[in-house]
Amino acid sequence: MSKMRIGVLTGGGDCPGLNPAIRGIVMRALDYGDEVIGLKYGWAGLLKADTMPLSLEMVEDILEIGGTILGSSRTNPFKKEEDVQKCVENFKKLNLDALIAIGGEDTLGVASKFSKLGLPMIGVPKTIDKDLEETDYTLGFDTAVEVVVDAIKRLRDTARSHARVIVVEIMGRHAGWLALYGGLAGGADYILIPEVEPNLEDLYNHIRKLYARGRNHAVVAIAEGVQLPGFTYQKGQEGMVDAFGHIRLGGVGNVLAEEIQKNLGIETRAVILSHLQRGGSPSIRDRIMGLLLGKKAVDLVHEGKSGLFVAVKGNELVPVDITLIEGKTKNVDPAFYESVKTFFNK
């Protein structure tokens, strides 16, 4: 069993579960006698050869810590050819045998491109949006849902106290998994997701029915990527675009709150959960899945695999070609959304 020098990085938005994955990688690598090197702040770490050692002592107590001890960024080395070449050079200078990238579609997509250039790469999926194809689960989703549920519970208390409608804006650029699951588990009175064009008149009638039967408040959950019909508002600040071309979203909750108040005459406030959904100690599931995904990634490295990520399929962890998720989004089935509308308050 040959010893290896394995690099690890975390890219894109942070989320709970990254540190457990790092711990899982290091713990499994120790079984092989490997040396693990952390690349700081995502692909920027490879570009700048900015590293840190990942020893047992460094990771033994990080299971319950949110975020990532390696730091993260949205650096895209493929924006410039010279950056690509610098990364390839640094990979060799650091004497890496393989690199494990923990991230979403963008981070894993970069890993896939480097794999095609001959650098051994394995991916671990993470995103609180749970919108990656080919996998049933992504790190961070479970904890983020818990945060959304807790927020809805707290906001319902204040909505009830002041006889208001509160609109909760939840992350989800193209997919509404977080808003739908968080809204259902939190008992939101109505939920809007990007996959289904919103019917505002249906929403207004729903709130009218609640008030007609004596209820004095409502909580509406909406994913940040929802496009309200008839509005041409900018769903993100002008010029606020990341290295992968994504506009930073935010604001649909405020627009919806204004429309509810204007059309129903009920005081309405908007709350944007934003980065609260990314922080905090990982849930039990995110801790266990992080450990298992990290372990499997190291095993794939020792099997000589590259260009793959560890997918969750039922109760199994299986290697999947990263190219199968590039440019794709795992969306909520509109039929499923319609079926669970029965749980919206009546």
From Swiss-Prot:
Subcellular locations according to the entry: Cytoplasm
Site (Important for catalytic activity and substrate specificity): 106
Reactions catalysed according to its record: beta-D-fructose 6-phosphate + diphosphate = beta-D-fructose 1,6-bisphosphate + phosphate + H(+)
Activity modulation comment: Non-allosteric.
Top-rank lineage group of the source organism: Bacteria
GO cellular component: 6-phosphofructokinase complex
Binding site for substrate: 127-129, 164, 171-173, 224, 269, 275-278
Gene3D superfamilies, sorted: 3.40.50.450, Phosphofructokinase domain
Active site residues per record: 129 (proton acceptor)
Residues annotated to bind Mg(2+): 105
Pfam family, one: PFK
Binding site for diphosphate: 13
Site (Important for catalytic activity): 126
Keywords noted in UniProt: Cytoplasm, Glycolysis, Kinase, Magnesium, Metal-binding, Transferase
GO BP term, example: fructose 6-phosphate metabolic process
Cofactor dependence: Mg(2+)
pH dependence: Optimum pH is 5.7-6.3 for the forward reaction and 7.0-7.5 for the reverse reaction.
Main location: cytoplasm
Protein family: Belongs to the phosphofructokinase type A (PFKA) family. Mixed-substrate PFK group III subfamily.
Quaternary structure (record): Homodimer.
Protein function: Catalyzes the phosphorylation of D-fructose 6-phosphate, the first committing step of glycolysis. Uses inorganic phosphate (PPi) as phosphoryl donor instead of ATP like common ATP-dependent phosphofructokinases (ATP-PFKs), which renders the reaction reversible, and can thus function both in glycolysis and gluconeogenesis. Consistently, PPi-PFK can replace the enzymes of both the forward (ATP-PFK) and reverse (fructose-bisphosphatase (FBPase)) reactions.
Name recorded for this polypeptide: Pyrophosphate--fructose 6-phosphate 1-phosphotransferase
Species: Dictyoglomus thermophilum
Gene name for this UniProt entry: pfp
